[in-house]
């Protein structure tokens, strides 16, 4: 797994390369990260990567040529390692929203090249010539694509075999297929009683079936309350059992009473 990032701020990516579980995995060689600054692919004394937009308007637009040259260099470096050409992902508010399914797809491949835009955006001709995918974190605007790329890489890398100490941890994450796309249940650790609030009794029982059922019901309760559309999706995909449906019906009864 190799990620390449085209960015004006390569130092930002030390966060995912050097810190936490992704940093440890990088040190172990489970994935690689290479940053490419488009300023290194300019030919003027000022290393210009942006200019005013045609037609007028506020802000500046990133120029196509430095970006395309950076992508070409990244693809060539991948080819030299025997890797196939990577998808080129532009972080953009016009992109498809990134979710756990996208992270799983990304983790199953050999990596990607992320394009981190700045200013008002990037020249459309670069998008048409080089970009294969556009992705977004959500309906809000960031100062650049770097934070979005960091989040997307983190979500994908933690799914790689050997990255997490407990291989089952990722399977129990919210939105994961092992949870049928639902939110995860609440978690508790020591002490057994904190400020007068005890750990729920089922978690102390040692009865694995009861613990599993309690966690499933809490997952259903939380998802129905916070993200009801995920319940409908799971239902439409046939992921809810009869016991799940009975519990959800009881929740509806609680709300009505």
Swiss-Prot record:
It comes from the Bacteria. It catalyses: guanosine(37) in tRNA + S-adenosyl-L-methionine = N(1)-methylguanosine(37) in tRNA + S-adenosyl-L-homocysteine + H(+). PANTHER family: TRNA (GUANINE-N(1)-)-METHYLTRANSFERASE. It is an enzyme of class 2 (transferase). It comes from Bordetella pertussis (strain Tohama I / ATCC BAA-589 / NCTC 13251). Belongs to the RNA methyltransferase TrmD family. The keyword Magnesium does not apply. Specifically methylates guanosine-37 in various tRNAs. Keywords: Cytoplasm, Methyltransferase, S-adenosyl-L-methionine, Transferase, tRNA processing. It is found in: Cytoplasm. Transmembrane segments: none annotated. This is tRNA (guanine-N(1)-)-methyltransferase. GO terms for cellular component: cytosol. Its main location: cytoplasm. S-adenosyl-L-methionine binds at residues 117, 137-142. InterPro entries: Alpha/beta_knot_MTases, tRNA_m1G_MeTrfase_C_sf, tRNA_m1G_MeTrfase_TrmD, tRNA_m1G_MTases_N, tRNA_MeTrfase_TRMD/TRM10. Its EC number is 2.1.1.228. One of its GO terms (molecular function) is tRNA (guanine(37)-N1)-methyltransferase activity.
């Amino acid at each position: 797994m190799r990620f390449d990032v085209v960015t004006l701020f390569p130092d930002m990516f030390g966060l995912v390369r050097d810190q936490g579980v992704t940093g440890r995995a990088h040190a172990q060689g489970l994935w690689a990260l290479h940053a490419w600054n488009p300023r290194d692919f300019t030919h003027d004394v000022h290393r210009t990567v942006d200019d005013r937009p045609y037609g007028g308007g506020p802000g500046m637009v990133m120029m196509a040529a430095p970006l395309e040259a950076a992508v070409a260099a990244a693809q060539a470096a991948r080819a030299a390692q025997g890797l196939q050409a990577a998808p080129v992902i532009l972080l953009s508010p016009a992109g498809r929203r990134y979710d756990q399914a996208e992270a799983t797809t990304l983790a199953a491949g050999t990596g990607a090249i992320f394009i981190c835009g700045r200013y008002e955006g990037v020249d459309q001709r670069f998008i048409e010539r080089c970009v294969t995918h556009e992705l977004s974190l959500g309906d809000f605007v960031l100062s650049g694509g770097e934070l979005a790329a960091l989040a997307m890489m983190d979500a994908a890398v933690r799914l790689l075999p050997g990255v997490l100490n407990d291989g089952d941890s990722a399977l129990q994450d919210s939105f994961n297929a092992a949870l049928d796309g639902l939110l995860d249940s609440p978690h508790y650790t020591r002490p057994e009683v904190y400020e007068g609030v005890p750990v729920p009794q089922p978690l102390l029982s040692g009865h694995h079936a009861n613990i599993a059922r309690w966690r499933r019901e809490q997952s259903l309760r939380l998802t129905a309350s916070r993200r009801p559309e995920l319940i409908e999706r799971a239902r439409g995909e046939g992921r809810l059992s009869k016991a799940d449906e009975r519990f959800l019906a009881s929740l509806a009864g609680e709300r009505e009473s």
